């Protein structure tokens, strides 16, 4: 990730806040008449640097937390006895659940860092995932996430559908495409997705594949076929750099994505790495000016 000098970062934040202040005086005249985006969830890709995860994402309305993996490289990120050795740093799911942004947990199951390796081990990862599920029955969970991602280039994706069919529900899986506007994306998905499995669609904005507006068109097409509750968009809160690495998206970049996803339930990838407290404050402030109340109020039940 690119390192930004503190002074430059302060200027960026000051500029963003100044623009919001200028807009705030007349925002009540141009508040969106459409439904605001419902920022429900936050992903976390566990690593040693961000364990345990901390943040203020509840200010955006986040109440569901998605640790991408419970187990990766056959080592567990949680301190529960689930039959795997543990990473040097790990967390307790019940303690995680006490955070306001993790009132609900969709538990990521067994995966691998390397996508090709994960795809080649789908059957074994499903078996490991069932073991995790069996060992976490006493923990209240919103559902499970099987962390083997699919795209149309995976010719053997049918085996993923078979693996998903063996796991308890509610269950989620994620999909993406390296094409800006993939043709027959819904047909491809329907060819292997089990009926009771839900889908996270990665918007592809962070990796530079498409614009937020293009992502919305794809999302609408998928939801027309599968239903709005079955397909949820994942907002990539990062941007690719010329060096091939990734940086955190600037607040105004995230805002552009959120505007494109009005009326939709949104999950963000990922909080601990890319959504720091200042970014959250700025986006939450914009949300309040744009829609007339805070994201937290809009999404509370």
List where the protein language model places each region:
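Bacterial N-terminal signal peptides that target proteins for export
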Residues: 4-13
């Amino acid at each position: 990730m690119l390192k930004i000098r503190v002074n430059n970062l302060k200027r960026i934040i000051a500029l963003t806040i100044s623009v919001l202040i200028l807009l705030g005086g007349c925002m009540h005249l141009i508040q969106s008449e459409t439904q605001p985006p419902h920022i429900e969830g936050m992903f976390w890709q566990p690593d040693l640097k961000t364990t345990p995860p901390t943040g203020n994402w509840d200010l955006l309305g986040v109440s569901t937390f998605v640790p991408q993996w419970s187990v990766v490289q056959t080592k567990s990120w949680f301190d529960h006895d689930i039959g795997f050795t543990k990473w040097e740093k790990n967390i307790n799911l019940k303690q995680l659940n006490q955070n306001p942004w993790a009132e609900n947990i969709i538990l990521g199951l067994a995966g691998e860092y390397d996508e090709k390796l994960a795809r080649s081990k789908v059957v074994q990862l499903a078996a490991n995932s069932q073991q995790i599920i069996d060992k976490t029955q006493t923990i209240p969970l919103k559902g499970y996430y099987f962390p083997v991602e699919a795209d149309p280039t995976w010719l053997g994706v049918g085996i993923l559908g078979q693996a998903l069919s063996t796991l308890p529900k509610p269950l989620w899986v994620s999909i993406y495409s390296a094409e800006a506007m993939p043709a027959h994306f819904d047909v491809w998905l329907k060819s292997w997705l089990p009926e009771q499995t839900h889908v996270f669609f990665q918007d592809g904005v962070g990796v530079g594949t498409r614009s937020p507006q293009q992502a919305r068109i794809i999302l609408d097409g998928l939801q027309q076929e599968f239903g709005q509750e079955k397909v949820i968009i994942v907002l990539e809160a990062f941007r690719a750099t010329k060096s091939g690495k990734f940086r955190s998206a600037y607040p105004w970049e995230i805002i552009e994505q959120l505007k494109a996803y009005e009326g939709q339930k949104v999950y963000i990838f990922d909080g601990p790495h890319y959504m720091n407290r200042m970014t959250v404050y700025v986006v939450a402030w914009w949300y309040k000016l744009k829609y007339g109340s805070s994201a937290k109020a809009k999404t509370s039940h």
